[in-house]
Amino acid sequence: MSQPRPLLSPPETEEQLLAQAQQLSGYTLGELAALAGLVTPENLKRDKGWIGVLLEIWLGASAGSKPEQDFAALGVELKTIPVDSLGRPLETTFVCVAPLTGNSGVTWETSHVRHKLKRVLWIPVEGERSIPLAQRRVGSPLLWSPNEEEDRQLREDWEELMDMIVLGQVERITARHGEYLQIRPKAANAKALTEAIGARGERILTLPRGFYLKKNFTSALLARHFLIQ
């Protein structure tokens, strides 16, 4: 069997994207890095986004860190998901930065969260720390859109969390709020502050926040599609 090659330009169809992702299944991160001419770091402490960058190179992703989807022409977002030996997610999944100001008139339909989750290419990757990074294998990809029930669940959480932000309660939001979608601080250090609205409607400085999918949501999603018991 011939070795796969990284896509040099963005895929033109979902079928092409999925076919390329399927070719990567079973390869280790070290093998894919070597084939792409990259060095595999010893661990992810200083290169937290390295796996995502590696797979973006292989799949011809275009967006980088821009707010649009990774495959903008197709409207598809790429999400790598570290899993254990049973295929269960090991951590929450970052969706996008949570807007803390300028939220008047924003609805679920026009929200950044929904835009990012409209169509997702999930790629599970072995994530247990006992496996050296270079030896972790890439799993079978899944091209997913939320069904009616998933959309409703996410919408309810998003509306609850956005209400708290708009009403000046951002400092009271914990990771326990929201059944499937949560908001958590997202900052490399505690000095990176951003503007938000305080309890009396005043401007305050707080840590930037991000929207994350909880493990119970992604676990059920993967289990349903891969028939994990």
Curated annotation (Swiss-Prot):
Organism, scientific name: Escherichia coli O157:H7
Alphabetical UniProt keywords: Cytoplasm, DNA damage, DNA repair, Endonuclease, Hydrolase, Nuclease
NCBIfam families: mutH_TIGR, PRK05070.1
Gene of this entry: mutH
Functional description taken from the UniProt entry: Sequence-specific endonuclease that cleaves unmethylated GATC sequences. It is involved in DNA mismatch repair.
Keyword Nuclease in annotation: yes
Keyword Nuclease: yes
Family of this protein: Belongs to the MutH family.
GO terms for cellular component: cytoplasm
Example GO molecular function: endonuclease activity
Primary subcellular site in the record, as a coarse category: cytoplasm
Pfam family, one: MutH
A GO biological process held by the record: DNA modification
Locations listed in the record: Cytoplasm
Highest taxon listed in the record's lineage: Bacteria
Gene3D superfamilies: DNA mismatch repair MutH/Restriction endonuclease, type II (3.40.600.10)
Record's protein name: DNA mismatch repair protein MutH
CDD domains: MutH-like
SUPFAM superfamilies: Restriction endonuclease-like
